[in-house]
A protein has these predicted regions:
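Phosphoinositide-binding peripheral membrane targeting modules
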Residues: 55-119, 124
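Anionic N-terminal interaction surfaces
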Residues: 2-72
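Terminal and domain-flanking low-complexity segments
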Residues: 3-6, 16, 132-162
Length: 162
């Protein structure tokens, strides 16, 4: 590798830190989801963009939320979504969505590449998965290329409604 290859290589992923995050994700998920050990896991995020218009001043503010997403195949494929924080110090209550009870589930390509699930007619879940994101203040620090691909395949083949 030449000098330019070393200069423009980009950040390296700390695999030990990533493995620690995966263990924390598993512990949190298993603590709040019944039979959590049966699920495969992927870290994800959700975003909420709000626009404002104050006369001459226009803009938007985006807030991000970290998620632990579990999925399991079987006779009734299920997705479980657990809200958490980027450092994985705690989590909220899970939203468990068996395929048989979901109103609609699809992958939205535009404006964001998100997996959208309508567990009922009142609200929806927007799940954005990633291989690795550098900003550990906003996102869970985890290297998860194979897990992301596995979730994408599961969603497309077993879970999506359209």
């Amino acid at each position: 590798m030449g000098i330019f290859g070393k200069l423009f290589k980009g950040p390296e992923i700390d695999q030990a830190k990533s493995a620690d995050s995966k263990q924390k994700m598993r512990r949190l998920f298993d603590s709040v989801v019944p039979d959590g050990e049966q699920y495969q896991l992927v870290a994800a995020y959700t975003e909420d963009a709000r626009r404002f218009n104050y006369g001459l001043v226009h803009g938007s503010k985006t807030t991000y939320g970290s998620l632990i997403v579990g999925w399991k195949e079987g006779t009734d494929p299920t997705v479980a979504v657990v809200p958490t924080v980027p450092d994985l110090s705690g989590c909220g209550d899970p939203e468990i969505c068996p395929r048989s009870t979901v109103k609609k589930a699809y992958r939205n390509k535009y404006p964001t590449d998100a997996f959208i699930i309508y567990p009922d007619g009142k609200h929806y879940l927007a799940i954005n998965t990633f291989e690795w994101l550098e900003d550990e203040k906003l996102f869970i620090y985890v290297d998860q290329g194979p897990e992301q691909q596995a979730f994408e395949t599961f969603f497309k083949t077993c879970y999506a409604t359209k």
